[in-house]
Amino acid sequence: MPVTEFSFKDPYTYQNGFDSYHESEAIEGALPVGHNSPQKAPYGLYAEKLSGTAFTAPRHENKQTWVYRILPAAAHENFVEEDASSYHTLSDAKKLQHIPNQLRWDPFDLDETVDWVHGLHLVAGSGDPTVKQGLGILLYAAGKDMGKEAFYSADGDFLIVAQHGVLDIQTELGRLLVRPNEICVIPRGVRYRVTLPDGPVRGYICELYQGHYQLPELGPIGSNGLANARDFQAPVAAFDDEEGPTEYRLYSKFNNHLFSARQDHTPFDIVAWHGNYYPYKYDLGRFNTMGSVSFDHPDPSIYTVLTGPSDHVGTAIADFVIFPPRWLVAEKTFRPPWYHRNTMSEFMGLITGNYDAKTGGGFQPAGASLHNIMSAHGPDMHAFEGASNADLKPTKIGDGSMAFMFESSLMVGVSEWGLKTCQKVQEEYNEHSWQPLKRHFKDPRKAQ
């Protein structure tokens, strides 16, 4: 069966479908029938709208959700900026270093001393969240549960790629459990709390500052394939009912700065909701992989799970691409990804296993690489020599492995933390990968 066999059981119930109009109520009758904001909402609830696009966005792009909650989201004290030394998402665009070097990182460390909010580290990015342009690439590593707290990003949509450990995510709209080999998208503004039911966690995030993630167009593939809409899971309504005053802290990532505010009630008090703006998760094991059944290696765009499109058709601010287990059957073909210089930037990570274009040992689970715009890259020496001389029988590759890529049309700058502070950059990446490549050319015009 094309699903991942998880060792940690998911206790939650979900609604299925990508970009579907869902509705859910934790108490029967909490959803108004036939209208959105009645004079008095059922059970004394407040009606509140959560907008993910402008009101007048085209219908096929419009993202809105109506929620019915015990107290409005506005009921909190003023926000105060946190001490900059306490978090790691801050990036002045001028301080990002844009360099043409190919970069590769050793596995990033687990950190059992911090929670989700304080375990976010900006590695690279481009653009400006204040004008809703660009993206940010973050690593997360945490070992503590969030307490009576909630967090949201006003900057963009978080696409979370779990690499190690289990995330129990309590959102305003319901609960999701996210395990390695699953991804989760939490839209801009949705408040949530992360607890860790199976110990420390680590993974990757691509924050999309503009627009929202979509399924890629399938074109000649047809009506099914790649990530199918029915396999995405959205939460059902669930709420905490705390009648007495209880202090909560609300964190906001706002222009990559961290702010906090106090409130005297739970943020997780939405009893019912309906709309198409909500968090969701997806099991990467359900991806229906396509490939060549004749010759040549296709473009990696055929492995796209989700895309964050730019204003130029066919060009993405962020594509999320995976390299799952698959059969290679192409005849008379160099089967690994080819050598490449790309007008797009490519940030890669490894959830588990290995990657067929990097067999030399330096690309490891929980590590990463960045090949920026027009920075040459491709198979290392070991991969080239092996694939050039391999017996071209049908071969299954990637069993137990899952590599991924955040690809962007933007030139990506690297943060001080990503380049130096983390101390994970492999200084000899080029020396180990491509400098050992041998000259095989023999000019037929010259006497042998």
From Swiss-Prot:
Q: Where does Fe cation bind?
A: 340, 346, 377
Cystine pairings recorded for this chain: none
Q: Give its E.C. classification number.
A: 1.13.11.5
Its induction note reads: During growth with phenylacetate and phenylalanine.
What are the GO BP annotations of this UniProt entry? Answer: L-phenylalanine catabolic process; tyrosine catabolic process
List the CDD domains. Answer: cupin_HGO_N
Protein name as annotated: Homogentisate 1,2-dioxygenase
Species, as recorded: Emericella nidulans (strain FGSC A4 / ATCC 38163 / CBS 112.46 / NRRL 194 / M139) (Aspergillus nidulans)
List the top taxonomic levels of the source: Eukaryota, Fungi, Dikarya, Ascomycota, Pezizomycotina
Gene that this sequence comes from: hmgA
